[in-house]
Each structure stands twice: as C-alpha cells, then as structure tokens.
C-alpha cells in the first residue's frame, strides 16, 4: 500500500506535468498566433500589391482600348453610318473608309477619312473636331459638312451645310467657309479654291439621291460606279467630257438613270452584268445636236 509521501510525490509529479503541458500549450498557441498574424500580414500585402497591379493594368488597358483605332470600311454599292463616342454622327458613302479611336481621350477629337462622308459634329467649344483627308485638315467645333476625298479623284472637296469650318494643310493656317460654300483642294497643283455651290449637288447622296448640274459624264460615271458597284466604260473623249444636268430620286436603279440620261440624245449604253459601256450612236457626229 502506497504511503502518504509516495501519494503526495505522485500528485506533485502529475501536477508538474499538467502545469508543464499547459505552459507548453500556451507557448505553442502564442507562436501559432504570431505565425498566422505574420502570414496574414504577408497575404494582405500580396493582396494589396495584386490589387494595385490589377488597378494599374486595368487603367493601362483602358487607355490602350480608348486609344485603339477602329477602321470602318464601307463597301461599294452601300451607305452606312456610325455614331462616335462624343455623339458625332458620320454617314459614309460607298467605297469609304473611316478611321477613328474607340473613345476620344486627352481632349483630342480626330478622325481620318478616305472616300466620302457627311459629318454631323457634336458641339464642344473646348475640343475642336479634326478630319484628316490625305494631307488636308478640316477643323470644326460643331457643324454639318461633307468631305469627298477618294484616292482616284483629282480633288478633295469640303462642302459646308451648317455652321463654320476651317480647311488647310495644317490646323493653324485655315481657310474659313460658310454654309453653301466649298473648298476644293487640287492635288496636282496643291492649290485651294473657295467657291459658292449648289449644296444639294454635294449632299444629296446622304438621302440616296443624285443632283447633277452641268456635270461631265466621266464624273457622273464615278459616282454611279461607287453607288451601284458597277464598272462603266465611256467610249470617246468628247463623250467623257459631255455635261449633264439631272435629278434622280431614291429607288431608281442604274438602268433607269442611264435611260433618262440618254433619252433624246445620240448616246446608247449596254449593260452586261456589272459592266456598262456608254457610247455614241453610230450615225451621230456630235453628242448634242
């Protein structure tokens, strides 16, 4: 039978062991707490850095997205329109390419056009709107105007419908025009001509119409080629230079237009698919008697 001393000693050993285990557990819990606090701090730092990195990347991507140029190509035989990020509406004629940013940034509003386009520019006094057509610049604040600048044309024409625009080879030295006026830039001589025009003759295409006033046939043929996606061959220099006047409304096809143009004139035309040939009648010596 155990003596009192042995029992007391055994209890003391057990108490010391319990006390040791408790102290050890507390130390381990403290160490674990410190460890997880450090891990949490590191994780928080990584999360913060990741968040900042994502924020920077997002905004860099946003700028890249907004500065990215969009090229809109309108095929032959069609008209189309687009509304830019500032609210400006652009109507594209057949065979026209418009280059513009996804969104205007840094206060710059500039687009490029190759072909023909009618602009309805959203007014912004602080940020002028600039159209580049080859080496010609058109600068406006808010207005309606037409730009015709096809690669195969000899001239670039800017015709004003409303407001006021400036036209030049840069954005500083500009020629100002008023509604009903046109600036014609002659590519060969690098000269500008300012003149009064019949506005409908240069903007009717927006509504699908044609207004020709003493237009040479070769110029009319180019418009018809683009609008109807056909090829027109004119036989004879005198016929190419012959002037025509006429108005044609929406819905008339190429055959109807040519029929009206050649009526009561010593001219005939033949249509084979998308190929059209215009020539003088065999017995005619002059285009117009």
Regions found by a protein language model. Give the residues of each.
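Disordered, charged N-terminal biogenesis/targeting segments of membrane/secreted proteins
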Residues: 1-31
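A residue-level detector for the "anchor" residue at the start of short, highly conserved motifs
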Residues: 21, 25-27, 36-42, 49-289
């Amino acid at each position: 039978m155990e003596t009192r001393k042995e029992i007391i000693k055994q209890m003391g050993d057990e108490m010391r062991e319990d006390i040791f285990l408790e102290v050890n557990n507390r130390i381990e819990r403290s160490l674990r707490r410190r460890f997880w606090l450090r891990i949490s701090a590191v994780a928080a730092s990584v999360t913060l850095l990741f968040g900042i990195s994502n924020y920077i990347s997002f905004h860099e991507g946003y700028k890249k997205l907004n500065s990215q140029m969009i090229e809109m190509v309108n095929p032959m035989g069609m008209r189309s329109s687009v509304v830019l990020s500032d609210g400006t509406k652009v109507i594209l004629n057949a065979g026209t390419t418009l280059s513009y940013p996804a969104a205007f940034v840094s206060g710059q509003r500039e687009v490029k056009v190759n072909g023909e386009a009618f602009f309805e520019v959203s007014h912004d006094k602080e940020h002028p709107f600039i159209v580049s057509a080859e080496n010609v610049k058109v600068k406006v604040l808010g207005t309606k105007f037409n730009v015709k600048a096809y690669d195969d044309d000899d001239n670039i024409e800017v015709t004003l419908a409303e407001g006021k625009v400036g036209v030049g080879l840069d954005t500083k030295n500009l020629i100002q025009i008023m509604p009903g006026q046109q600036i014609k830039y002659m590519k060969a001589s690098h000269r500008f001509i300012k003149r009064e025009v019949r506005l409908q003759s240069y903007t009717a295409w927006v509504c699908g119409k044609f207004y020709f006033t003493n237009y040479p046939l070769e110029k009319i043929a180019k418009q018809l080629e683009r609008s109807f996606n056909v090829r027109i061959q004119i036989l004879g220099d005198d016929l190419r230079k012959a002037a025509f006047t006429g108005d044609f409304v929406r819905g008339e096809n190429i055959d109807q237009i040519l029929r009206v143009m050649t009526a009561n004139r010593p001219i005939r035309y033949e249509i084979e698919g998308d190929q059209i040939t215009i020539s003088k009648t065999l017995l005619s010596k002059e285009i117009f008697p």
